[in-house]
Amino acid sequence: MKKLILTCALMTFGLMAFAQSLNTLTAKEKKAGFQLLFDGKTLAGWHTYNKPGVIGNCWTVEDGVISFDMTKKERGDLITDAEFENYDFSVEWRISKNGNSGIIFNVTEDLKYGSTYNTGPEMQVLDNDGHPDGKIFNHRSGDLYDLIKSSSEPVKPVGEWNTARIVCNRGLLQQYLNGVKVVETRYDDANWKTMIAGSKFKNMPAFGINMKGRIALQDHGNPVWFRNIKIKKL
């Protein structure tokens, strides 16, 4: 019985310690210059795309996690108040069964652009096995959506947390999924323009031309969760 009580106590302590470590920076991260983009309690620093100062009720915070609820009426991508140029960004995400979402970056916010993807490239978030997009070779989790297929697929099963990392540094883009680099390309050269011309974004003249912009969490109509959102200016 004593062993059981001790085991339960250790498990409880471990869970409490883990919860306390969510949405925080380590001493090493602080020294390196990282900053939190999500405080774990509020959506301060974020708003609904093209609605400055407004956060749709589809986005809520519970237990240190940003949650998307597709049943709510006030919809739209959640986007940072600030713009970033040359940065190291990371976020943990969890997708629902058959779900689809994404992390869209270098976004220009302007009423003439109806969606974040009119200007910003996307790192795909997907249930590869359950969503129809999983059958499209460059629409799977970790892909640079509709542009570059991931070099490998270290994605975890639906319901588990994944870590996405996007590094934009003076024209060089690197995407990491669960610590593995899965995409590397330049976003300032002729090859980039050629890729766009061969993609579904070819008729969007403002797509992929920004060297800086906002970062968005996509409302694609399916439940999705985000936490531990951090960025470092390079």
Question: Where in this protein do the model-derived segments appear?
Answer:
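Bacterial Sec-dependent N-terminal signal peptides
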Residues: 1-21
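Carbohydrate-interacting regions of secretory-pathway proteins
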Residues: 20-234
